[in-house]
């Protein structure tokens, strides 16, 4: 597979191409406020399987679902406790992951077979725009082979995952 290097920007063409890859079950690396994430449609088992394959990660290691807005969270989790609501109000969007009891909508492959799911809302314009346009939560661990350093640049992602993912 050829990996397409797209400039990490809010450019409509780049975002639309990334969304098309995601809708076709492919993987796309995208920037967040911390590191690059390796995104797949978090509700598509075949796409999620590709994350584990590309990273060489065991499938019993749960993934984080990234959302763009709170309406997405309500579909993924059974309840939002007062404590979780406090954290959401104070720290989202931002680099905080919160673990919730999941709904049946969340594939077991995403949760590593657990009855919980980890969710975060990134505070990065490109990440949020991509998730919003894709209109699905993105399962997105760091965009690197398991055991390697988490990438902070598109160049680092390309050096590690070129040929294993559709786009950066």
Where do the protein language model's features map onto the residues?
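Active-site-adjacent structural elements in enzyme catalytic cores
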Residues: 1-168
